[in-house]
Amino acid sequence: MSQPTYDARAIVLRKTKLGESDLILTLLAEDGSQMRAVAKGARKPASSFAARLELYSVVDLLVARGRSLDIVKEARLESNERLRRDIEHAAGAAPMAELLDRVTQMGLENPRLFALTRTALSSLGRVDPAQVPAVCAAHLLKTLAFAGLRPSLDACVSCGR
């Protein structure tokens, strides 16, 4: 009997090795919640998944419900060429993904996080390398605010002025 499937749009935040040929994907779903799924065979040299599950990319997925983790059956990539080929731009996306991995939770929806991150990653693909830190910092501050963790920047921590 086949497993029930569903469509999901998500951003790939992290890839973790599982066994010899599989990957566990940590994703930011379109509803802003965290999602984890297995991409079977994604680490094999001839895998079609390898090129379609790039870090910091928006992907359209067909996912089957699994016992503990869902299973990616199909993936379609919205490529961000500059993030893939330029180390400065990819380095700007890394702290964004790390923070999102820490502030998002499975089942806790925050759709503004997906929209913000998609826009920031798209911006990273268009800006000069000198502007990458500004885009990254803006995303980090907005993410903290959307997660209810906005730092107070209008007064000195030491003296309160």
Predicted regions and their residues:
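Non-catalytic alpha-helical scaffolds and adjoining flexible linkers that form interface surfaces
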Residues: 1-161
